[in-house]
Design a protein with these regions (language model features):
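HEAT/HEAT-like alpha-solenoid repeats
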Residues: 1, 26-42, 64-77, 102-116, ...
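Hydrophobic residues within the alpha-helices of tandem HEAT/HEAT-like
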Residues: 1, 12-23, 38-41, 53-62, ...
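Short inter-helical turns and helix N-cap capping residues of alpha-solenoid HEAT/ARM repeat scaffolds
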Residues: 4-6, 43-46, 78-80, 120-121
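Amphipathic alpha-helical interaction segments
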Residues: 4-8, 19-30, 45
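N-terminal alpha-helical segment
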Residues: 12, 31-34, 51, 67-68, ...
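Short acidic, glycine/proline-enriched loop segments that cap or flank alpha-helices
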Residues: 78-81, 96-104, 119-123
Length: 153
């Protein structure tokens, strides 16, 4: 997957994506190794769609609580595509995650999403605001008010 040849990298990401889709929960032991590599490959524009699809397939294998550090690293990635796609993945994950799990991980994710909402890249900003909106939809206005008050109007 760390090959410099685009075709080789793209094929390996598609293979991993299909493995995740097929194995579902059985792929969980390998997720912590996979996520940072996929996020790193997001820096290449030609691989962006395949990497995002690979991350989306992870929703069936792992909880966002288990990959908290990896997702936070993706939200801090130096490439805007990494930040954007990670925030979009997080938005989808928020909608399908049990509320008790979200309650445990929300402070970590929300602090970083508020920072990303002030990003210079408009796509990253929009993705972070989408994830914040998903959190607001799950938790309500009263819980989110302390985080949303930090945003610039």
């Amino acid at each position: 997957m760390s090959d410099s040849n685009i075709v080789v990298s793209q094929t390996s990401i598609k293979v991993i994506s299909n493995l995740i889709k097929g194995l579902k929960k059985d792929y969980e032991p390998y997720v912590k190794d996979t996520v940072p590599l996929v996020i790193a490959k997001l820096r290449d524009r030609k691989l962006e769609a395949d990497c995002c699809a690979c991350l989306d397939n992870l929703l069936e294998s792992v909880s966002i609580e288990d990959i908290l550090d990896e997702i936070l690293a993706g939200l801090n990635d130096k490439g805007p595509a990494g930040r954007k796609c990670t925030a979009a993945f997080l938005e989808k994950a928020i909608l399908v995650t049990y509320i008790d799990v979200l309650t445990r991980v929300a402070p970590s994710y929300l602090a970083q999403l508020v920072k990303n909402a002030d990003d210079t890249n408009s796509e990253c900003r929009d993705a972070a605001l989408g994830a914040l909106g998903a959190f607001k939809g799950r938790f309500g206005e009263s819980y989110m008010s302390k985080y949303l008050s930090e945003l610039n109007p």
